[in-house]
Amino acid sequence: SMFPFSSDWHISYRDHFSYAKEINRLKEAYKDKIEILLGYECDYVAGVSCPTKEQYPEEVRPDYLIGAVHYVPWEKGYLGVDTFFDKAREQINGVFKGDVKKAVQEYFACEREMLRDGDFQILAHCDLVKIQNSKKAPYPLFDENEGWYRDSIRETADAIAKSGVCVEINTGAIARGKLGVPYPSLEMLEMLHAKNVPITLSSDAHSTEHIDYAFDQAVELAKKAGYTEFMYISGGRSLMQKF
């Protein structure tokens, strides 16, 4: 999405209109063969950007919106959650005075704020911060088995259930060789299942060859957590499909 700012990984304001125009052209051209939807992944940055459909002009308004947290602002700086390990470590040292626990807790706090204030249908990679425990990292940034971390995902699972959004099982980090498992973790997915939170499948593809990457692994994880169906959007409605 063009919000909150223009960068290599945010579409520019100018290009947003041509992108939406092309998607809407393809919708019409292929309407007898496939249903095409216009959707964006929009960043939540406290005080800067919140994923809501109303912020988009009518000609680029999406059929659905995915809410995501990639940036954790704190005092005079921010943590880029999905950045390289060394950069994240540097930002935590500078912005959070080296307090990894505080940085991770603030990430989940930002996610809960977005769930409270946003207007979107799907929550993106809801434990993205574990990317810093990547198999490409020199060492894990934190221990996902510690009580404070499990408390954070439990509190966030409660907020997700209260908000009514759908959670994606996201295989993007597998495709890009950073993790061996999808987002979210099995433990968090089990919490979500217990609260009747619907799920959907997402490859978070950055290239066409990854469009359905590791979906078999995502389905296996979903079933292990107790899920038997997933959500998809069609005709402006959220529908359920058995695996």
Predicted regions located by residue number:
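A metal-dependent hydrolase metal-coordination microenvironment
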Residues: 1-87, 97, 101-105, 210
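Divalent metal-binding pocket/active-site signature
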Residues: 2-3, 64-160, 166-169, 173-176
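Aromatic/hydrophobic pocket-lining residues that form the small-molecule binding cavity
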Residues: 16-23, 107, 149, 153, ...
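Acidic (Asp/Glu)-rich catalytic clusters
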Residues: 22-32, 54-63, 115-119, 155-164, ...
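Residues that form generic nucleotide/phosphate-binding pockets
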Residues: 26, 106, 110, 221
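Short secondary-structure transition/capping segments
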Residues: 34-45, 78-91, 118, 168-175, ...
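Structural preference for beta-strand elements that scaffold enzyme active sites
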Residues: 35-39, 63-66, 121-123, 164-168, ...
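Charged catalytic cores and adjacent phosphate/nucleic-acid-binding surfaces used
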Residues: 129-131, 136-243
